[in-house]
């Protein structure tokens, strides 16, 4: 190996560490500049409470005097929110009506939830049922077509329905004014046994289920 070759090799070896050090320093500076850790101004906002929640729509029915109360949650919880109330008889429950007599029953429906009911309906069952009342029964078979009912919205002073029980059954759902959260609406049911019926209508009963519904 010549003297000049050895000197050149030695020179390269002396500059190699310096080149490596310079490269490492450059990489570090580049990394720092890209990460922004040398930035002097920083601003931030953290929204720690971001929530949304659903309301509840529930119904309460009461008789006159509020001695009997039925709620839509009586059938379980708000997850079910549907109940059957057999303790409020909107046709009065009289078993001794005579021709020409009217029995009136007032009730109230309240929106006990936290949201408004966008629709409010009263839906009769599809069939009015005639049955025997006691052991002495007439032979008539059309009591549902004779007995009448007038349903009045006493809060709005409007007639909801007026006609026979059979007609109510065949008429389908009846739309009622919407109910705000906490609002109470009064209704009355005036059931009449016509004065024109004779002995064949003695000892008979008519029944028809009615369903109140809120929806939002």
List each language-model region with its residue ranges.
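Long, small/polar-residue-biased beta-strand-and-loop interaction regions
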Residues: 2-216
